[in-house]
């Protein structure tokens, strides 16, 4: 009986690598990458650290995690090639949600594409000391005075101490003001004895208004800003 011979073209199209190579010359992006088109990088990076940023982080995180589970971490290469502006968003999402392994991978393999200028600020805001330490040690991403301000506000003494010892960005009076407002006495004490930025009248106003008597007593004894 005659046999049906497969054409060379069909044999070529059965090889996944060849198909991917052919597809790379076509316009558009792979179907699994299309959902990432819905995120505005420029708007994201200009959003301050409050609920407005969480509105963007939460849906991106909800998309990213199952996508990585379906395609493996190696698929990031295609994502970053097709949508390079998405790379820093992946980094910021990994930092905020504490995905240390993903942060380590991005630092090792994608530091030039996936760097965020506010990486350490975001880690401090989220209270992830181990990630902040990694970012510092591997020089992956940026840091500003907001890191210590947010570390103090969140009650993360380990972060405040580390930034004081290892970084030079410092903080603002907002660090002690917010630590006092939220009753973080140990941080108020550390900032008073170890740093020079000080506070404003708001520190005593807020701590008194919120009933943090120990903080009020400390500020009354050691500071001279007074209260309004």
What are these regions (language model features)?
Residues 1-228:
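Ankyrin repeat (ANK) tandem alpha-helical domains that serve as protein-protein interaction scaffolds
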């Amino acid at each position: 009986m005659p046999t049906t011979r497969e054409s060379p073209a069909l044999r070529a199209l059965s090889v996944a690598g060849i198909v991917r190579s052919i597809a790379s010359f076509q316009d558009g992006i792979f179907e699994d990458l299309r959902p990432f088109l819905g995120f505005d990088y420029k708007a994201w990076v200009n959003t301050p650290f409050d609920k407005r940023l969480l509105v963007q982080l939460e849906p991106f995180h909800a998309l990213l995690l199952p996508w990585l589970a379906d395609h493996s971490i190696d698929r990031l290469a295609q994502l970053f090639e097709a949508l390079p502006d998405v790379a820093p968003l992946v980094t910021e999402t990994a930092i905020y949600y504490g995905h240390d392994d993903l942060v380590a991978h991005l630092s090792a393999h994608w530091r030039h594409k996936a760097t965020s200028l506010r990486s350490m600020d975001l880690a401090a805001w989220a209270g992830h000391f181990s990630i902040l330490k990694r970012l510092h040690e591997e020089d992956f991403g940026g840091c500003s005075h907001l890191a210590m301000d947010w570390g103090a506000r969140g009650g993360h003494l380990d972060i405040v101490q580390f930034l004081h010892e290892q970084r030079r960005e410092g903080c603002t009076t907002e660090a002690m003001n917010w630590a006092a407002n939220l009753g973080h006495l140990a941080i108020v004490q550390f900032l008073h004895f170890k740093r020079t930025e000080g506070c404003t009248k708001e520190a005593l106003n807020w701590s008194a208004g919120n009933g943090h008597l120990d903080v009020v007593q400390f500020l009354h004894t050691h500071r001279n800003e007074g209260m309004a």
